[in-house]
């Protein structure tokens, strides 16, 4: 939402504690994102490039990964409140709005709020909507969730195929 047109993508997300994430986009174009602690690699096979960089030091950017992995106390990174208008998700559970903390100057904040919907029986995250200050909304819906499947560390290691250009990204930090 908020973009000139709605962009849809699908894929598979893998998480492992502590601080490991792999996101394989399948549609519309294949991409792979790897996160290990503060290191990020984004591989775009179509362009034969991998972008290598660091997560920002802003709490608003690190907290979603910690949230997905259950590593952080929500109160450390967010002010929790019911979603506006008392909206409810599937099963009647209230949606939760998370307002980022830790950004001293509001002008530097890129995320206005994150809205969460949890599955009624398991309390596993079902939907995460990231509302940006500029009005854009990125909504992630999780289906076919499997927990404690014993993912191997190698799944989160990326080695660029031969001929792939490695590009060092600028540090994603406030000016």
Task: State where each predicted segment sits.
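Short, solvent-exposed helix-to-loop capping segments enriched in aromatics
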Residues: 59-75
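An acidic-aromatic
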Residues: 12-63, 138-139
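Edge/loop elements at the starts and ends of beta-strands within beta-rich repeat scaffolds
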Residues: 4-6, 121
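Gly/Pro-enriched, hydrophobic low-complexity segments
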Residues: 73-163, 167-168
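Residues that act as N-cap/strand-start positions at coil-to-secondary-structure junctions
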Residues: 7-9, 17, 27, 74, ...
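Short, solvent-exposed mixed-charge patches
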Residues: 173-175
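A short, Trp-centered hydrophobic/proline-enriched beta-strand micro-motif
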Residues: 1-3, 14
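A generic structural motif
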Residues: 1, 24-26, 43-45, 99-101, ...
